[in-house]
Structures are given as C-alpha cells and as structure tokens.
From Swiss-Prot:
Lineage: Bacteria, Pseudomonadati, Pseudomonadota, Gammaproteobacteria, Pseudomonadales
Protein's name in the database: 8-amino-7-oxononanoate synthase
PROSITE patterns (UniProt xref): AA_TRANSFER_CLASS_2 (PS00599)
Family: Belongs to the class-II pyridoxal-phosphate-dependent aminotransferase family. BioF subfamily.
Reactions catalysed, as given in the entry: 6-carboxyhexanoyl-[ACP] + L-alanine + H(+) = (8S)-8-amino-7-oxononanoate + holo-[ACP] + CO2
Quaternary assembly: Homodimer.
Function: Catalyzes the decarboxylative condensation of pimeloyl-[acyl-carrier protein] and L-alanine to produce 8-amino-7-oxononanoate (AON), [acyl-carrier protein], and carbon dioxide.
C-alpha cells in the first residue's frame, strides 16, 4: 500500500492549518523584504536586535578568515575548536555555573540533555505547554513520561509522588506561544522537596530577562541548586545560532559521554562561535537594549488594550493576541500584511484548539513609531475582520430564514 500523502496535505489545507514558508529576501531586522514585498516585521525572535549588528557581523567575518566556514567534524573527533571552547567558558561564567556545553540547535540540546539523564525505570515530568522539542525528548527518553497542568506546582507534586527512579522535571522558562513565565521558585521547591532535578529551557529568556540578560533564573534570583540543568539558545536573544547546556562538572561530562545529539553531529562553524562571543559581550554591556525593549512592550500593551484586543499575561517580548479560529487568525494576518505589517498567525496543533492567535514579537531594534504603526494597522484590521464576520453571520441567518 502506498503512502497517501496527497490526502493528508488536502486535509490540512481544508482545516486552514497548512504551513508555508515565507521567503526572506533581506537581512533580519524590523524592515524586511518577504516574497518581494517590503514589510515591517513583528515576528522575529531577534529580541535584542543583534542578528544584524555590525560588530557581530565583523566578528563572524574575522572568525571565518581565521577558522574557515565549517566545523569539520564532531566535537569529539577534531571539531572542537578554540572559539567553541572560549564560548563555552564565557557562557559558564555568564550563567554562574562551572561549565557549559555547546549544541548545534536548541532542539538537539533539549533532546540530548533529557535522553542522557533519564531512561527506562526513570521518570520525566513536563509542563503541558512545553516546546515540542522538550516533549519529543521526554517521549524518546524511554522514561515514564507524564505532563502536569500548565504552571501548576500542585499538579506537579501529585505526579512526583508517583514517580520512580531518577526524576527530571522539565519546563520552558518563557512559554513560546503565550509569553508567560514558569513559576520557577514554586516548581523548584516542589522538585527539591521530592529529590527531583529541575531542567529549564530558557530559550526566550536569555537577553530580555534579568538585570544583566541572564534570563529567568537571574530574574528570580535562583541558582544551580534550584535549577541543576539550564538550557539556552543562541538564535534568539543572542542573535546568532546554536544552543548550550550549563551546569555542574558532572552534568556536562555526562552529556559529553551520553548525549547522542552532541556526540554524533558535526560542530557548528567556529566563526559562529566568534560572532556569539561578540553578541554576548554586547548583550551584557548594552543594558539600554533591555530597557528600550521593556518600554516598547509596555507601549504596545497599552495600545492593544485600548483597541479592545485580547492579550495574554506577558511582560516578555512575546505578545500574543488571541483570535480564536484558525481562519480568522490567518485572515487578520493577511489584512495586516496588506497594510505592510508582518505578524505570524499561530494555529493548532502548535496551540490548543480554538486558541489561534497572532504572535507579535517585539525587538530592541524596533522604534516607538514602528510600534505605533503596528497598533494603527491592528485597529484597522480588527475592525475589518469584525465587519467581515458580522456580514457572514447575517448572510447565514438570511439563508436560514
């Protein structure tokens, strides 16, 4: 029997869930060209505006001249170069931990950490709204896998009471589709009381959160004792690419020995590590980026609430606007695009049914005037969408008469 892929694709189209790739024809930044159209983008995760920073670009160029453009081999063969090692030392110091270990992607870091730490006879407990890479890691680990209610320490405690073997509690730091923060102090207390380890994927926290950009752990004033396993990605707040795990000497050595996504892959280009060293320097030095970003977030929320839009409880750069139906979310995104604004429409299965949304993301590279332009376009588009929905309802009522 052949694979009926055409039917699967047709069903996805019929449900307004078909994914397509926009073609970016410019550098990352607020002003982009996508599929030939100039747009003002509010959908990038380049939270501090470092992806196109001249000093980061210069560091990448110099790194390529010195180290070439390929990693060449895995870290355990001959792919662990000087810049990789220097970046690991810098990330360890930045996170206040003995060591850090580089991975090529955030997905690989999450998969590598979970599967190296737990297996058959152990338990992994995850927040229901965790990123797909964390959920996949839990399922693939071979450990008993269960999800607790979103950000609910009591639900976690009930599952911990039934846990067996080594137990790993896993949560996003900032939830990527909602923008809210994990209740780390409460989750850490519950995990510690029951002898479990807490692993936090702070992909969206490093850079925007914390006095020095140290993410959610710094934001809450926690340390390695409360959060033994800390994951960070480098393609968001850092503006480059890759990911890392930070923790104890024993943790990192365990990953070197047992994390298959680390062992069996070519290292990232060393020039990228050179660029990340520069972006880390800028992230720590230029606190004005976090301050400006926080002001833009507050400005956007005031304006969106004045328009009557339904926002989620978030003070991070991720500012979702709840729409409900997938078709309506896509229509609203299309209306914004017609006005020169690019915002992503997020639909099931990425988010729960009937909670489709626009995922607005803000960056320190945006200006107040650009945020005001977004709000103006949102107001016009929301009124247009409401009028269209009302016309559809009236037409349906007419058909039923």
């Amino acid at each position: 029997m052949s694979f009926d892929l055409a039917s699967r694709l047709a069903a996805r189209r019929a449900e307004d869930l078909y994914r397509q790739r926009p073609l970016l024809q410019s550098a990352q930044g607020p002003d982009v060209v996508v599929d030939g159209q100039p747009l003002l983008a509010f959908c990038s995760n380049d939270y501090l505006g470092l992806a196109s920073h001249p000093e980061v670009i210069a560091a990448l160029r110099a790194g390529a001249e010195r180290w070439g453009v390929g990693g060449g081999a895995s870290h355990l063969v001959v792919g662990h170069s000087g810049p990789h090692h220097e970046l690991e030392l810098a990330l360890a110091e930045f996170t206040g931990r003995p060591r850090a270990l580089l991975f090529s992607t955030g997905y690989m870091a999450n998969l590598g950490a979970v599967t190296a730490l737990v297996g058959k006879g152990d338990t992994v407990l995850e927040d229901r709204l965790n990123h797909a890479s964390l959920l996949d890691a839990g399922l693939l680990s071979g450990a008993r896998f269960s999800r607790y209610l979103h950000n609910d320490p009591a639900s976690l405690a009930a599952r911990l009471d039934k846990a067996e073997g080594n137990t790993l509690v896993v949560t996003d730091g900032v939830f990527s589709m909602d923008g809210n923060l994990a209740d780390l102090p409460a989750l850490a207390a519950v995990a510690q009381a029951r002898g479990a380890w807490l692993m936090v994927d702070d992909a969206h926290g490093f850079g925007p959160l914390g006095a020095a950009g140290g993410g959610i752990v710094e934001h809450f004033g926690l340390g390695q004792e409360q959060v033994p396993v800390l994951i960070g990605t480098l393609g968001k707040g850092f503006g480059t690419a890759g990911a890392f795990v930070a923790g104890s000497e024993e943790l990192i050595e365990t990953l070197v020995q047992y994390a298959r996504p680390y062992i069996y892959t070519t290292s990232q280009p060393p020039a990228v590590a050179c660029a990340t060293l520069k972006s880390l320097e800028l992230l720590r030095r230029e606190s004005w980026r976090r301050e400006h970003l926080a002001a833009l977030i507050a400005r956007f929320r005031r304006g969106a609430e004045a328009l009557g839009l339904t926002l989620m409880d978030s003070f991070t750069p991720i500012q979702p606007i709840l729409v409900g139906g997938s078709r309506q979310a896509v229509a609203l995104a299309d209306m914004l695009r017609a006005r020169g604004i690019m915002v992503g429409a997020i639909r099931p299965p990425t988010v729960p049914a009937n909670s489709a949304r626009l995922r607005v993301t803000l960056s320190a590279a945006h200006s107040e005037a650009q945020v005001d332009r977004l709000l103006e376009a949102l107001g016009e588009s929301w009124r247009q969408l409401s009028s269209s929905l009302l016309a559809e309802i009236e037409a349906e009522e007419g058909d039923d008469a």
